[in-house]
Amino acid sequence: MTADEKGLNVSSADGSTTLHLGALVQFDSREFFGDGGGVLNNSFLLRRARLISDGTIGKYTSYLFVPEFGNGSGGTATTVAILDAAVTVAPTTAVQFKFGKFKSPLGLEELQGDPNTNFVERTFVSSLLPNRDVGAVVTGSLFGGALSYTAGLLNGIADSTTASGNSDFDNDRDVDARLWAQPFVADKDSPLWGIGFGVGGSAGREKGTSAVTAGYKTDGQQTFFKYGSSVYADGEVWRITPQASYYYGPLGALAEYVVSAVNVRPSAPTATTALPKTQLENKAWEITGSYVLTGEDASYSGVAPREPFNWANGTWGALQLVGRLEDVRIDPKAFPTFAAFATNANEARAWGAGFNWYLSRAVRLSQDFLQTRFSTNGRLPTTQILLHNETALITRVQLSF
């Protein structure tokens, strides 16, 4: 048994059965400026509070179980939820089978660990993708890690949504798949070693109001677009998301694009009436860059400081600067049949800058300055949030082990 900044680890004598206990706590402060007289609430928020249990049972089986006790993105209290509950059977690195509830295998930023994202909140690209779903996938790594793949069947959920239960809302399933290539991964001394690129996609059929996204949010987690309450998904849904990243020493970069399509009707069909359905295609892109001022390597899994912060010894951990641009555009056909002009933006453009201070492998302080501009079809919105640019200063204290 060992206990350190990576958590509590227990292992059998032969090492075939292991248990790791960890946690993730993210405490945020959100301050909004220029919102026209206190429209947005400045507040403290327990964004995430999770207990993490993972390990192995025998030679080929591993598991992950994560309950969520935090407030989530909305800033209001929530019930305890099972975030991840998955079992993986891995006969080889090339062929592994995963069953349960886990992140949908689509987006590069979405698949990044929640403690390791460059900014405290993900971009619009992740808003147009599902979060966690229930299903089964086959995954693996080939050619020494130069190519990895995932493909499988999942229940299927709306954009920016986590499956809330163990059952599906209709009789159909979604097919999810992703390919990721790192062609120079074997040459660690090459400046091309950190290049990665790939594509994720999903396709299926969905029916019901629950298959329509509950809304898209800004970096400050304010809803700027939401379909009408009666809008009914009925037919094909699909997503495609090309993606790439690059890491070289202290430099890191990540870029992603997504198209998310759904067929919808203004209301649910009845035995006598079925209003025409329309395919809507919403699109988003993002570019994120980072640089570690203290010289440590940037990576997809975060920054590990050479020396932890120690006032007496004069060591300061690692300091990273980050910046990003992002944009999301709603299909013009959404207005006004499926979304009201007065209460929704048709486009949101945002930029952000910030820094991350890694006091140790387990403790991180972050501060992000983020601004979002809205386009509202050339009309004056009635929603106060859309009348002004969103300017937010978000500070986070994070403990992760």
Language-model segment annotations:
Residues 3-207, 281-314, 318-336:
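Outer membrane beta-barrel
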Residues 37-38, 88, 191-193, 201, ...:
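Outer-membrane beta-barrel pore domains
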